[in-house]
A protein has these predicted regions:
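C-terminal capping alpha-helices of c-type cytochrome domains
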Residues: 68-94, 126, 169, 389
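Electrostatic cytochrome c docking/interface patches
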Residues: 18-36
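Conserved beta-strand positions in repeat-built beta-propeller and related beta-rich domains
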Residues: 129-134, 171-177, 215-221, 258-264, ...
Length: 411
């Protein structure tokens, strides 16, 4: 699957943006299948968006199957028409680097087509959760049986985005399109919502608990960070010192201080957990745009430099920063990232197909694998309690479990 253009097409699918995508009319070429494209695709997408997404005939059909059910004859006719008139465009290819570690990747198609799983969550009971951003649901998968269940969000079109779990097993999520944070009790399905106290905090993004049970979160477009006390629902917000810095990924260090990356600029920032004062650190390259961040046990931060195609390292103790070119090059668009047992894992979302990348800081060696479905942009990933990984494959409408089988002698 052709990951970047495909996911940009899939991003616009159904619930949240359906009405907004109907504008920007274009003139489609005459031919067999034109009327079906106008009837089926234009319900939720602008035809300009459709026309700008170039795929092969097979890839169009793969896309349909993850978004909507179409009769096979209609799917074939639409795919043939689009592939003829809007052919596949050149895109960066994945670079596969062999190595001593073996992994197996198993993917599951989630129940609601077109839901666009955004973030995955590996819970303490061994289940895998995901946010169905466009379907307005939270989903749960038991990877041992394949059983899945979806829980509808309380507020319509709230855009469930980030996910985390508290010590009681409740699932917390950010309602990215509704300015709220939600708590789901998976035993009852009951949801408690916490609205942002400031309307400018319109899009809560990444949530993470600290060691004291306080929920910290970023607010990307609102240019803020926040904290929520689950005991009383109190929310405090702080504005990023840099305008339009786009606070994005967030982690907590061993001392309980939240760190976040600023996707709109080349900065990493720390929040004082007591005063909520924000201190920013500027990364050396002005073109760097850190999107997600991971942290190792020594409190060193690792970030995906989405714009430059690099893996970055920042040591808060010394202020030193260093980076490495991602295997698939400057257009690889590193995205979801996690640290597991001292090893850095991340996704390359800009290549065809998306890749899973392993980086060993001790040897500075990379190893990569392709994601079977193509990935469709892996926006986030998380480590499981037993040392594996879970992924959300947004544009492919799937979640995945990566089982890591370490070879003898490998680190």
């Amino acid at each position: 699957m052709k990951s970047i253009a495909l996911v940009m097409f899939a991003m616009s699918w159904p619930v949240i943006a359906c009405a907004q995508q109907r504008g920007a009319a274009v003139q489609l070429p005459e031919g067999h299948g034109k009327e079906l494209v106008e009837a089926n695709c234009a319900r939720c997408h602008s035809l300009g968006l459709v026309a700008n997404a170039g795929f092969s005939e097979k890839d169009w059909q793969d896309l349909f199957s993850s978004m909507v059910k179409l009769p096979s004859d209609q799917s074939s006719e639409i795919a043939a028409y689009l592939a003829k008139n809007f052919p596949e465009k050149p895109k960066p290819r994945a670079v596969v680097i062999p190595g001593s570690v073996n992994v197996s990747i198993k993917e599951w198609l989630v129940p609601t087509l077109g839901s666009r799983p955004h973030d995955p969550l590996a819970t303490a009971d061994g289940n895998i959760w995901w946010t169905g951003q466009f379907a307005n649901v939270l989903g749960r998968l038991d990877p041992r049986t394949g059983a899945m269940k979806e829980f509808p969000a309380k507020t319509p079109q709230s855009g469930p985005h980030g996910l985390t779990e508290d010590k009681q097993g409740n699932i917390w999520y950010t309602g990215n399109s509704a300015g709220l944070i939600g708590k789901l009790d998976p035993k009852t399905g009951d949801i408690t919502e916490y609205k942002m106290p400031n309307p400018a905090a319109r899009d809560p993004h990444t949530p993470v608990f600290d060691q004291k049970g306080i929920l910290w979160f970023t607010v990307q477009g609102g240019n803020m960070v926040g904290r929520l006390d689950p005991k009383n629902g109190d929310i405090k917000l702080a504005t990023s010192p840099t305008p339009r810095s786009l606070p994005y990924g967030m982690v907590i260090d061993s001392k309980g201080a939240p760190w976040f990356v600023e996707f709109g600029v080349n900065k990493i920032a720390r929040i004082d957990p007591t005063t909520m004062e924000i201190k920013e650190y500027t990364l050396p390259n002005s073109e760097t745009r850190p999107r997600r961040v991971a942290i190792t046990k020594d409190d060193v931060l690792w970030y995906s430099d989405y714009s430059r195609g690099y893996l970055g390292r920042f040591d808060p103790k010394t202020g030193a920063a260093r980076d490495w070119p991602s295997p698939s090059g400057p257009q690889s668009r590193p995205y979801g990232i996690v640290a597991l047992n001292g090893i850095i894992w991340y996704s390359e979302s800009g290549v065809t197909p998306n890749t899973l990348v392993r980086f060993d800081p001790a040897t500075e060696k990379f190893q990569t694998w392709v994601i079977p479905s193509g990935g469709g942009v892996v926006r986030n990933m998380m480590a499981t309690r037993d040392g594996n990984l879970v992924l959300a494959c947004s544009g492919r409408n799937r979640v995945a479990l990566v089982t890591i089988n370490r070879a003898v002698g490998s680190r």
